[in-house]
Amino acid sequence: MREYAVFTSESVSEGHPDKMADQISDAILDAILKEDPYARVACETLVKTGAVVLAGEITTTANVDFEAIVRQTVNGIGYHHSDLGFDGSTCAIINMIGKQSPEIAQGVDRQKPEDQGAGDQGLMFGYASRETDVLMPAPISYAHRLMERQAELRRSGALPWLRPDAKSQVTFAYENGMPVRLDAVVLSTQHDPEISQAQLKEAVIEEIVKPVIPSEMFHAGTKFHINPTGMFVIGGPVGDCGLTGRKIIVDTYGGMARHGGGAFSGKDPSKVDRSAAYAGRYVAKNIVAAGLADKCEIQVSYAIGVAEPTSISINTFNTAKVDEELIIALVREHFDLRPYGITRMLDLLQPMYKQTAAYGHFGREGSDTAFTWEKTDKVEVLKDAAGL
């Protein structure tokens, strides 16, 4: 398959309305898992001017204050005053959460935990590449870092006129499957009305873009599109309705890898949309880190109520150092991809999900985002088994 000559990915900030919804859903999931690790949670959130709507299905023994969690999350993101168009302390909260269908539960629950069935049918993908030090595609990796930098400068007060809502988009030129130069950066950030566009553009380029992207990637033709529509004062849920699960490409690989269509946030690990996608990343990252391939995409699929995957497929894009059939055999031998096996392998019953809900679920290795699916603890066993 011909490689892309250029590739673009986007990210959004924690104050983007869709990401607000994701964070609320995952904050509720975390609060429930703290009290009831085996709860069944499917929590959806909608945010719009002055209101948060919760819906979905939750079956749990936990006693959770949904309203308090919503308000704490919204205020923590930075929407804590009516001047910003949304105030977590005064917004209306509508709760429409019910319980999980017993017909779904009977397909998942088993007397022996290892026989736990998948919570639904579906297909999931995992991916890793040698493009960056975290084995992620460069465009999405740097798009996320731009958004994290925007939030850092906003929270620290270094650029006090920044507001929570923002988006980034990064285009890299490629040669031989590797990024070689930065062709374009798009960054739109919400701001106070007093700041001039000239000041904003200079600050964004000098304080956000240049500290994040390696200097050797810039060239004379690099294009900067900073707040290209001009004023961006009205943002967050006032500007756009936000929904859980509407940023699935931002959450994963920025379009560089395939996506099975299932969102992550608000779902407990029995939902393979989430847990199997995490397992896919874990498998692909260990394959690449072990040197079995320079690039790897794995697909797994499931049937509702059935523990074993219905299929496991690998694509190394002609970069494999060993036969792909051997790689699949090693995956089956060394990674338990049954739902219970994934949960145990990656310790997924911990209340850690709110941290995943902004700036990407993959490629993050910070002290508070050292997610288990980013470990490369299978490298030596894979190398030995492959004879490398």
UniProtKB/Swiss-Prot annotation:
ATP binds at H16, D165, A166, K167, D240, R246, K247, A263, K267. Mg(2+) binds at D18. GO terms for cellular component: cytoplasm. It is an enzyme of class 2 (transferase). Transmembrane segments: none annotated. It comes from the Bacteria. L-methionine binds at E57, Q100, D240, K271. It catalyses: L-methionine + ATP + H2O = S-adenosyl-L-methionine + phosphate + diphosphate. Its EC number is 2.5.1.6. Residues 100-110 are annotated as: Flexible loop. GO terms for molecular function: ATP binding; magnesium ion binding; methionine adenosyltransferase activity. Keywords: ATP-binding, Cytoplasm, Magnesium, Metal-binding, Nucleotide-binding, One-carbon metabolism, Potassium, Transferase. Its cofactor is Mg(2+); K(+). Pathway: Amino-acid biosynthesis; S-adenosyl-L-methionine biosynthesis; S-adenosyl-L-methionine from L-methionine: step 1/1. NCBIfam families: metK. Belongs to the AdoMet synthase family. Homotetramer; dimer of dimers. This is S-adenosylmethionine synthase. It comes from Acinetobacter baylyi (strain ATCC 33305 / BD413 / ADP1). The lineage of its organism: Bacteria, Pseudomonadati, Pseudomonadota, Gammaproteobacteria, Moraxellales. The gene is metK.
